[in-house]
A protein has these predicted regions:
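Subset of outer-membrane beta-barrel
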Residues: 1-321
């Protein structure tokens, strides 16, 4: 996730629309004039000392009514011991990946907008390197009076330019993880609460996998019962769904408290017969002077989870008297 706000909401809530530049990394159709001179920095602390982050800047050209963004997303895996096939350590190596983004979004009419993100991706694992060029295409609908939004994103349309195999550009190319997403968001009329939902990976409907634990016999030697067809279909459907909610304080949303849930994360990483918060996420955000600070925490497994910190501002605010 590019920001702590989205981490707290359990994922890429692509229908959300305001002046948060990090939202445009997930859906460039939300790029708007309020993001002119916006700056965002996001740091994600993952398991095993792995770190990732996103840095972005927005700029609006009023003459052509287009808002642009540029940014870089990174993930560093740390330092590894380098050993031969016999286990003899003969050095160290590092691994990291970067995605350089250039995006643009435009308002088509009062409620419809469209956008595109172009990304150059570079990966380095020891002496092996791979690059790719992808695009995210998106469209969005926003009804200001009803505070309702809907969006669709076609993510990772493109190709691998060079692979880890062979001589880079001549090696075998891999397929990119295409992801078609649909999202919705609604702020309640008489309550300071906003609900968001995302359907992801719609291009690969069956997201179930064979879990060997499902085939284990009980202590009494009884074979496990086969789930019904309806149960399997419902389980698969909810794996595509992630939901999040924001409790809002103040007219300018000075404070936001968040909660989210991902059924896919819970089903794939939760330990059977053990109670845990796998799949749940929490977050809080508040505005201090000209800065907005957000914190998000996602629980993936009993072994731990992720924490996310974001700081954003707008240079235009510093020019106001």
């Amino acid at each position: 996730m590019p920001s702590a706000r989205l981490t707290g909401l359990s994922g890429s809530q692509i229908a959300l629309r305001d002046d948060d530049l990090a939202l445009a990394f997930q859906n460039p159709a939300h790029l708007n004039s309020a993001m002119h001179n916006a700056l965002t920095y996001n740091q994600n602390f993952l398991l095993g000392g792995i770190k990732s982050g996103y840095f972005g800047y927005g700029y609006h050209l009023d003459k052509i009514k287009i808002t642009f963004q540029t940014g870089v997303q990174f993930i560093t895996y740390g330092t590894f011991k380098q050993a031969d096939e016999l286990g003899n350590v003969n050095g160290e190596f590092k691994a990291s990946e970067y995605a350089f983004t250039l995006g643009a979004g435009r308002q088509i009419n009062e409620r419809l907008s469209a956008g595109i993100n172009l990304k150059y991706i570079a990966s380095q694992l020891e002496a092996y390197r791979s690059t790719g060029l992808v695009a995210d295409l998106s469209g969005a609908y926003w009804h200001e009076e009803k505070k309702f939004g809907a969006a669709v994103v076609f993510r990772n349309i493109g190709a691998q330019l060079s692979s880890y195999e062979g001589n880079g550009y001549t090696g075998k190319k891999e397929d990119l993880p295409l992801d078609i997403q649909i999202g919705f968001t609604k702020k309640l009329k008489k309550a300071p609460f906003r609900l968001s939902a995302l359907l992801h990976d719609l291009n690969r409907w069956d997201m179930r996998y064979d879990n060997p634990l499902d085939n284990e016999t009980s202590l009494l030697g009884e074979a496990p019962s086969e789930p019904s067809k309806l149960s399997q279909e419902l389980n698969n459907f909810f794996r595509h769904l992630s939901v999040g909610g924001e409790l809002i304080f103040g007219k300018t949303e000075v404070v936001r408290v968040r909660i989210g849930y991902s059924h896919q994360v819970r089903k794939e990483l939760n330990i059977s017969n053990v109670r845990s918060f796998s799949g749940f996420s929490l977050g809080v955000g508040f505005k201090v002077n000209r800065f907005r600070v957000d914190y998000g925490m996602g629980r993936q497994h009993l072994a731990g989870g992720t924490t996310h910190l974001s700081i954003s501002t707008n240079f235009s605010e510093f020019r106001k008297k």
